[in-house]
Amino acid sequence: MDYRVLLYYKYVTIDDPETFAAEHLEFCKENNLKGRILVSTEGINGTLSGTKEDTDQYIAHMRADERFKDITFKIDEAEGHAFKKMHVRPRHEIVALDLENDIDPRETTGKYLSPSEFREALEDDDTIVIDARNDYEFDLGHFRGAVRPNITRFRDLPDWIKENKEVFMDKKIVTYCTGGIRCEKFSGFLLKEGFEDVAQLEGGIATYGKDPETKGELWDGKMYVFDERISVDVNQVEKTVIGKEWFDGTPCERYINCSNPECNKQILVSEENEHRYLGACCKECAEHERNRYVAKHNISDEEKEKCLENFKETVQQ
């Protein structure tokens, strides 16, 4: 595998995000890289793919900048590019929590736990482990015993915490996310909310899965990633499938977007059921005039009607 995927972030002052983003995009394109990078006055958050040579060049370029000299890159081997295009965009935040009073992780954040320390926390009955990711990420894979917030966007997490504050307030809290960036702010938010004992998995799931001591133990399922790979393995010791097929509840790790472009809900679906239900999450979406699955596969009106009949056998109507 000659390609690699880089995942990284750094909370650091960038005075002119717009100019930085434009110049950075040019550099990335010149070096054949593809991916998504967000830049703001609070720092940089990126994931990109390229050949080993091109990603080495990128790492060297970043570390030559005093602001990013100690940045940590999480590196995965890949068969090819994990993205179709290269985007570098200026944003208000590099991870959107949308708080009235923003959190600066350089000033307020939870205690950092190494992978081995985090594993101890997972096995501690007195510790509450909260997944800081979205529900569809959790449903594909998570740490054993972790709490699943009922959210589809990171910015909804503070409200969920406030609604459940009494359940967690006097507990030891440990949180985790994909690469660590969300927990930097989320753990800081918890401290601002009055939680006293707050810690986070340093480097996130991506680091835990590659740790030679923990080897990804106590992780079930796969880790959702925001690129064309969709998911990657974490647990090097044992393989478990915890995802459940949207229609029949059987074990499944295959995510698709609902074929209704106005819905786009992410659902776990087998190839057989994707065809059986026209790539949709419900009958209403299957009937949509701009159903992408119908258009892509040139489904006839007669075949479409047969597929719509299948919804009579399911609760997803």
UniProtKB/Swiss-Prot annotation:
PROSITE patterns: RHODANESE_3. It catalyses: uridine(34) in tRNA + AH2 + O2 = 5-hydroxyuridine(34) in tRNA + A + H2O. It is an enzyme of class 1 (oxidoreductase). Its EC number is 1.14.-.-. CDD domains: RHOD_YceA (cd01518). Residues 123-217 form the Rhodanese domain. GO terms for molecular function: oxidoreductase activity, acting on paired donors, with incorporation or reduction of molecular oxygen. GO terms for biological process: tRNA modification. InterPro entries: Rhodanese-like_dom (IPR001763), Rhodanese-like_dom_sf (IPR036873), Rhodanese_C (IPR022111), TrhO (IPR020936), TRHO_N (IPR040503). The keyword Phosphoprotein does not apply. The keyword Oxidoreductase applies. Disulfide bonds: none annotated. Keywords: Oxidoreductase, tRNA processing. The active site is at 177 (cysteine persulfide intermediate). Catalyzes oxygen-dependent 5-hydroxyuridine (ho5U) modification at position 34 in tRNAs. Belongs to the TrhO family. This is tRNA uridine(34) hydroxylase. The gene is trhO.
